[in-house]
Amino acid sequence: MRAKQHISDLAHHCIAHGMRHLVISPGSRNAPLIRAFAASSQIECLSIVDERSAAFVALGLATELQAPVGVLCTSGTALLNYGPAIAEAYYLRAPLIVLSADRPARLVGQQDSQTICQDNLFANIVKGSYSLPEEPETVAELELSARVIAQAFSTALSPCFGPVHINIPLDEPLYGGELMAESLIALSPLQLAEPKGMSPALWQEVESAWRGAKRRMIVCGQGVADAELQALLARFAPDKTVTIIAENTANIVGPWLVDRPDAVLLACDEASRSLLAPDCLISFGGHLVAKHIKLLLREFKPAFHFRLDPAQMGIDTYQCLSAELDLAPTTFFRRLAQQVEPAAGFRDLWALPEGVAENQDDEFLVLKRLLGQLPAGSIAHLGNSMSVRHAQKLASRADLLYHSNRGVAGIDGCLSTAVGVALATDQLVLCCLGDLSFVYDSNALWNRNLPSNLRIVILNNQGGDIFRRLKGPSVSPGYQDFFVAHHPVQIGKMIEAYGVAYRRCLASEIDGFSEEFLGLQDGPLVLEVFVDPTKRD
């Protein structure tokens, strides 16, 4: 048996289980892992030095590809830098495979260099934590290693996607030795968990509640485009007792749904709000951006609320959960849509009133222009926190896809995630974010693989503009310094230091820049738009 045979096996087995992309940050302890993966022609390896950015790039790849993507680092604090992206992957449900090199157990806690306790480091934000055997010497130990890898991938991929952490203790020597062209150990098959379905009694309860309700609502949370799900939900169009809520991040579109629920609720008088609440609610998917629809459903609780979630995590966003159904949405609606009959009613109340004044924020008008001009098939990656909110005020385009890091909704990796998305597709990817978000994640541009289909628009409002809009911070001591946090960074010079093409304009000049900005380029392009933070609704 060759030295580090289990590392060669790890690379072969990760590839066999569907990993085709790996983002590597350099180090010494992970040298055997780097050698094993870099030697394979079946996986694309990207080198990104900053581990925090690297993990978000991997997250973007996994989100767009809907497939397992790996991220690999050395031991010590390098691994801690993966934390924000792992948390986002956990709540966004992305199949991120975290591979960390480690010291042997005998050296942990013994003042050895670059050593922390890495086992179960992310226990609360991964679906599973695993550790490979230290330097296995027997076939039985290698077979155990193969089973651990298969179990990790099974957990990451079923019943819903999510991140897993595989820790790999490595002893010296770390360099040299022969790499095996194939594994000596048979591949352990994946044991993918399937949704368990529903008992006949529970089906009867759900169908009875649905048929008996006069005001029925389906809330579609954040998700990826799914043609079958889209077609199934379209079957409810003739039945206006059914209102379907789907923001652009749900990637479900149609004239029969409500894509701007908060706009409707904000235009509604207080006395009429209760009429917009359903008797029976079906929900699925990830987070909503809209705040007021959540407040409505918590205040005027439906008699029945059924959430579709094979992960069975007990999520009760609206504080009125009747039952969590262990079914995929397509399976559920395939059956429920058989009962659709034309009817009038509830949905008409959710029509956006005519004559509602359009938002006149500089930021909103810039986003409206750019999102309106994006070529069909493009992807809009919406940064936290104002960019994604402004985008919810626009009608969803059926020919675009929408991404956003709404799992945890932090600003720390928006740009790096967009880079990963752009690396996974040939379509144009527009990343919209604010100046603080850009500066925070500017190391996303410290990347030799930046794709030419990436466009970045920075809405520079001189700080964290969301805090100017909230009543609390604006009357707090230190408001400008500690909430808005205006910064002195000259963003243009920063971008030029990374060697990326850069343009700048005022919000009022966007019409003269948008065509060039969204057109074909030889590389990525950044447009910094200076907006007036006082010009807002």
UniProtKB/Swiss-Prot annotation:
Q: Which cofactor does it need?
A: Mg(2+); Mn(2+); thiamine diphosphate
Q: Which GO terms describe its molecular function?
A: 2-succinyl-5-enolpyruvyl-6-hydroxy-3-cyclohexene-1-carboxylic-acid synthase activity; magnesium ion binding; manganese ion binding; thiamine pyrophosphate binding
Keywords from the UniProt entry: Magnesium, Manganese, Menaquinone biosynthesis, Metal-binding, Thiamine pyrophosphate, Transferase
Annotated cofactor note: Binds 1 thiamine pyrophosphate per subunit.
Name the GO terms of the biological process aspect: menaquinone biosynthetic process
Reactions this protein catalyses: isochorismate + 2-oxoglutarate + H(+) = 5-enolpyruvoyl-6-hydroxy-2-succinyl-cyclohex-3-ene-1-carboxylate + CO2
- Family (UniProt): Belongs to the TPP enzyme family. MenD subfamily.
Subunit-level organization: Homodimer.
| Stated name of the protein | 2-succinyl-5-enolpyruvyl-6-hydroxy-3-cyclohexene-1-carboxylate synthase
Species name for this entry? Desulfotalea psychrophila (strain LSv54 / DSM 12343)
